[in-house]
Amino acid sequence: MSATATAAVSKAGAVKKDSVPEIIAASMVGTAIEFYDNYCYSIAAASYFGTIFFPAASKANPALGTMYAFLTFAVSFLARPFGSMLFGHFGDKIGRKTTLVVALMTMGISTFVVGLLPGYEQLGALSIVILCICRACQGVGLAGEWSGAALVATENAPANKRALYGSFPNLGAPIGFFCAYGLNLLLDSTLGSTAMQAWGWRIPFLCSAVLVIIGLDVRLRMTETPIFRKAVEQ
C-alpha cells in the first residue's frame, strides 16, 4: 500500500505500550502466512506439478514438465505490480485494515483452491488455466500484504522506532519458509514419495485455511492506524 497520508500526520503519536504485541502480531502473521503459501507452491512446482499438470511433457522429458510448472510459478511475479497498485490505491481510500484483510483472504482462498484442484487427467487444459489464475491471485495478495503490513507497522510506531517496527513484517518471511518446508519434509518422510505425488502434496495447501483463519482473527481485532484516522479527520 502507498503511504500518501503519512506526510500530513507526522504527529499522530506512538502506540500505547500494551498495544505493541498486537502491532507486531498483526504486521507479522499475515506476511508469514503469505510466504508460507508462496513457498508451498514453489515446493509443489519443483516436485509434483510437472507430472500432475503437464503429464505429456513430463513423460517426454521430466525436466520439461518441471520447467512448465515453474512457468506457472512465475505468473505470480507478473501479477505483483498490479497487486501493489490495487491495494495501494484502496489502502489510501478505505483504510489499511480492510485492504490487509482482503489481501490475506485473496492469498488464502487461492491457495486452498490449488489444494483442491484436479490434475490434467481430470480437467485437461482447464486445470492449468485455473492453476495460473490461482497463482496470479497469490501474487496480487502477496503484493498487497507485504507492503501493507510494513505500512501498518510504521504508522503505529513511535517516531524514534519506525525502522524497528518496519522490520517486523519481514520476520514473517523466514517463519513462512520454515513452516512450509518443515511441513513438507514431515509429510514426505511420513507418507513417502508415492503418496505425496498422488495426494499428499495437497495437505500443505489445505492447511493454509487454518492459518488464514488465525490470521484473520488477528487482523479483525486490530484498529486503523492513527495516521490514517487522522488523515480521514482532516
What are these regions (language model features)?
Residues A45-F82, L100, A125, V129:
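Extracellular/periplasmic helix-loop-helix junction of adjacent transmembrane segments
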Residues P55, M105-G124:
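C-terminal ends and interior cores of transmembrane alpha-helices
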Residues L117, Q122-A143:
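Hydrophobic core of transmembrane alpha-helices in multi-pass small-molecule transporters
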Residues A198-D217:
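Symmetry-related core transmembrane helices of the 12-TM Major Facilitator Superfamily/SLC fold
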Residues K161-D188, V210-V212:
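Glycine-rich segments within core transmembrane alpha-helices of 12-TM secondary carriers
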Residues M1-A46, P62-G65:
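Cytosolic juxtamembrane N-terminal segment immediately preceding the first transmembrane helix
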Residues F70-H89, A103-S110, I175:
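Central cavity-lining transmembrane alpha-helices of secondary-active solute carriers
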